[in-house]
Amino acid sequence: MIERIWSGKSWCYLLLLPFSWLYGAISLFRRFAYKQGWLSSWKSPVPVVVVGNLTAGGNGKTPVVIWLVEQLKAQGFKPAVVSRGYGGKSDQYPLLLSPETQPAVAGDEPVLIYHRTGVPVAVAPSRSDAVKALLAQYDLDIIITDDGLQHYALQRDYEIVVIDGQRRFGNGWWLPAGPMRERAHRLDSVNAVIVNGGDCQANEIAMSLEGEIAVNLKTGEKKAITELGNAVAMAGIGHPPRFFNSLQDKGVKLIATKAFNDHSEYTLQELQILTPHQEPLIMTEKDAVKCQHFAQNNWWYLPVSAVLEDLSVLNQVSQLVTTRKKLVYDLKQ
């Protein structure tokens, strides 16, 4: 129902407009207050790059974070990642992830990023605290924040907004009448706009999510996704239909799909009933990190990687880090 309202296909959004005006007024005031210095913000000694979005729901931020981290590592830089850790509940913050950290503690996306990239990852409600914890523990030269575009308490040097190219901004209204955390004109002040699928507009960078090889959660076996035969797909992400459609576009024959809420916690029983005849069950890599400890032989996940048509973002971020490092070096002389 909420997707229908946000897409502009229902007039029910009119009932929610008073709440949206309030949300928008608070959002605008907070950003203005930070710009004027009425609310304090903290500046990191190393560059901070924010990968965020203007809308609620999944847009492809995490694959962009992983892509950027991997590219920076390949160039010899030392990146780390901070996150709010949505869906996780830790006894203490900031929390530095380790190989044993579970999604229930740190959140599914931070755990996924940690295992995919191997770089230091920290989570905390205050991203500034997470950055400070990382800098106290590691020698770093850049921080990437997964989400956090609206977390103005942490100053940033470069802003990347990721847009779902198919849904874009829906009806354009602030939450809850629409999907917007901030209005579309906010794009005028960011450094880069990446569009995940769909058509790009002027000055936007096209991105696709590529992945053809499924991995078995239980055994680690790898197999072409099309070789799994008739399968069931499940997803607990911001926009599950995108995942289901991508599987069908790759030629996967889906006999059923099951959408869960984003950041859902799963049980063995509720997933087993999805495949009563032991059909292959395909899930996202984000879901897989939460199901690994009770995985079954017929469970598979599909890793995907972001592919950008334009590498200007990487070049600009690399130059940012290089310039900051040179400045620090010169000041020490």
UniProtKB/Swiss-Prot annotation:
Keyword set, alphabetical order: ATP-binding, Kinase, Lipid A biosynthesis, Lipid biosynthesis, Lipid metabolism, Nucleotide-binding, Transferase
InterPro entries per the UniProt record, alphabetical: LpxK, P-loop_NTPase
Assigned EC number: 2.7.1.130
GO biological process per UniProt: lipid A biosynthetic process; lipopolysaccharide core region biosynthetic process
Top EC group: transferase
Kinase among keywords: yes
Pathway: Glycolipid biosynthesis; lipid IV(A) biosynthesis; lipid IV(A) from (3R)-3-hydroxytetradecanoyl-[acyl-carrier-protein] and UDP-N-acetyl-alpha-D-glucosamine: step 6/6
Residues the entry annotates as binding ATP: 55-62
Family annotation (Pfam families): LpxK (PF02606)
Domain of life, source organism: Bacteria
Recorded GO MF terms: ATP binding; tetraacyldisaccharide 4'-kinase activity
UniProt keyword Protein transport present: no
Disulfide bonds: none
Catalysed transformations (reactions): a lipid A disaccharide + ATP = a lipid IVA + ADP + H(+)
A GO term from the CC aspect: plasma membrane
Function: Transfers the gamma-phosphate of ATP to the 4'-position of a tetraacyldisaccharide 1-phosphate intermediate (termed DS-1-P) to form tetraacyldisaccharide 1,4'-bis-phosphate (lipid IVA).
Family: Belongs to the LpxK family.
UniProt-listed HAMAP family: LpxK (MF_00409)
Protein name, per record: Tetraacyldisaccharide 4'-kinase
Organism, scientific name: Proteus mirabilis (strain HI4320)
Upper taxonomic lineage: Bacteria, Pseudomonadati, Pseudomonadota, Gammaproteobacteria, Enterobacterales
